[in-house]
Amino acid sequence: ASNQDFMRF
């Protein structure tokens, strides 16, 4: 998973 995947909150 990319960093942007985790920032989707």
From Swiss-Prot:
Q: Tell me the compartments it is located in.
A: Secreted
GO biological process entries: neuropeptide signaling pathway
Q: Where are the transmembrane segments?
A: none
Asked whether the keyword Cell inner membrane is assigned, the reply is no
Question: Positions modified as Phenylalanine amide?
Answer: 9
Arranged from A to Z, the UniProt key words for this protein are: Amidation, Neuropeptide, Secreted
According to its record, what are the GO cellular component terms?
Answer: extracellular region
Q: Which domain of life is it from?
A: Eukaryota
- Keyword Secreted present in the record's keywords: the answer is yes
Q: Which family does it belong to?
A: Belongs to the FARP (FMRFamide related peptide) family.
Entry protein name: FMRFamide-4
User: From what organism does this protein derive?
Assistant: Sarcophaga bullata (Grey flesh fly)
